[in-house]
Regions:
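Residues that form or flank phosphate/diphosphate-binding pockets in enzymes
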Residues: 17, 50-51, 73-76, 239, ...
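Long, highly charged, low-complexity intrinsically disordered interaction regions
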Residues: 42-101
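Helicase P-loop NTPase motor core
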Residues: 1-62, 89-90
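Structured loop/turn residues at secondary-structure junctions
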Residues: 14, 44, 69, 233-236, ...
Length: 309
């Protein structure tokens, strides 16, 4: 059966190019008479399809999910970014300041903000005896002023590198005995999402539309509807589709980065085979050269299957 389908391999510069191709190719496939319900996009982890799903929402292509896709904009890292942006746009809410004032560490005490609203001048006066903290508050004021003039992508970048939020993530990861790369991955996803939007209004409107779609998907669980199926390789077992796309077939994703032992890699190889054999007629395997701005290697499974570009 694996021998019968038409297999093609696509190699992209990055995930943006990959997603643009997928949305357009799915549209073409439907124009050629294949119903949406006979098309599937398969992936290794439920974090992967966010950008493509946002693309599908914008392109007005219906899809359903076999797995619960986490809302990345609900993540505490995203909430911190949005809080910085809210304050930069004029919020003086004590709650907003409390949530980010020590991310990164500025050694500012919570009791320095007794009122419901924050006034920078009064705040700095409180620390006249500790000028090094007053300086940090002043720097925060300058950072927020600068932030208010940036595009969404530049703003997230500045929060991470200019303000030092990535340093906070590294410290927090160490404190929690977690891997900082996992936190950076979330931050990278949010940064990638902001790309291409000139204003916060545009970006936030897009986020809202996507979140509504996620909610609707969760409520409706629209099965057997005419919609493209999005599924992890685990959830795809036993299903078959006329046309299948396997996305992000790169080292670190497929096989997954946590698969180190021989038997774990073997299980990943089996999953890859599961993905390949879901296609009745046409299989497209997609890989990228760069993911979240970093160079990534082609998956060893592609080489083993003799599908190298």
């Amino acid at each position: 059966k694996a021998g019968k389908q038409k297999v093609r391999f696509q190699y992209f510069e990055d995930c943006y190019k990959e997603n643009a191709f997928l949305a357009e190719d799915i549209r073409q496939t439907v124009q050629n008479g294949v119903p949406l319900s006979e098309i599937a996009v398969l992936f290794r982890t439920n974090m992967q399809p966010r950008a493509l799903m946002e693309y599908m929402v914008s392109a007005n292509l219906a899809f359903q999910t076999k797995d619960r896709i986490p809302d990345i904009y609900e993540h505490w890292i995203a909430r911190d970014f949005f809080t910085y942006i809210r304050i930069a746009q004029g919020s003086d809410s004590r709650a907003d300041f409390l949530s980010i004032m020590n991310r990164p560490k500025r050694y500012i005490g919570r009791d320095s903000l007794p009122d419901e609203t924050v006034c920078f001048d009064e705040w700095m006066k409180l620390y006249e005896e500790q000028p090094w903290i007053a300086e940090r508050i002043e720097k925060l004021w300058y950072d927020l002023k600068h932030l208010s003039r940036l595009s969404p992508y530049a703003a997230i970048n500045y929060i991470r590198r200019g303000i030092g939020y990535d340093d906070y993530l590294a410290e927090y990861a160490e404190y929690r005995n977690a891997n900082k790369e996992d936190f950076y991955e979330v931050a990278d996803e949010i940064l990638a999402s902001a790309k291409g939007y000139r204003t916060f209004e545009e970006w936030f409107a897009h986020i809202e539309e996507y979140r509504q779609e996620l909610k609707r998907l969760a409520q409706e669980k629209r099965r057997n509807q005419n919609a493209v199926t999005f599924a992890t390789l685990h959830s795809a077992k036993g299903l078959e589709f006329t046309k299948v796309y396997l996305i992000d077939v790169n080292e670190g994703v497929m096989p997954y980065k946590k698969a180190v032992l021989k038997q774990d890699v073997e299980e990943e190889r089996r999953l890859f085979y599961v993905g390949m054999t879901r296609a009745k007629e046409s299989l497209t395997i997609c890989s990228v050269k760069k993911m979240r701005g970093k160079e990534v290697e082609l998956s060893r499974f592609i080489k083993e299957a003799g599908k190298e570009p």
